[in-house]
Amino acid sequence: WAFNVITTGGAAKAYSPSGHNRFTIRQLLAPFDQTAYLCNMQYLPPFAIMGTHRLNTADIELHAVQYEQLLVALHNDRISEAEWKSVTYLNDLIPLPQSVMD
């Protein structure tokens, strides 16, 4: 597998054909998708945290827990190909915890 972990300053709506940035996140990451393809790797959707300049420390910590849970789930084969192919962002597969203790 291969996937990108990114942060953006803009909101999710900015990354669409009609948005400020004119392209989706997946379109902007197309060169990485092609590299994974050439290396015979499966390219998963990105883990993307949007609007990071508006996040406080607690929000950032929650996203860190979410990312850790994603890595554990991938490592333990708890996310199927059908599941990751059905989402725009890997974040969509792991609920954002309510606290860092979740």
Feature names for model-found ranges:
Residues A36-D102:
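Glycine-rich phosphate/pyrophosphate-binding loop and the adjoining helix
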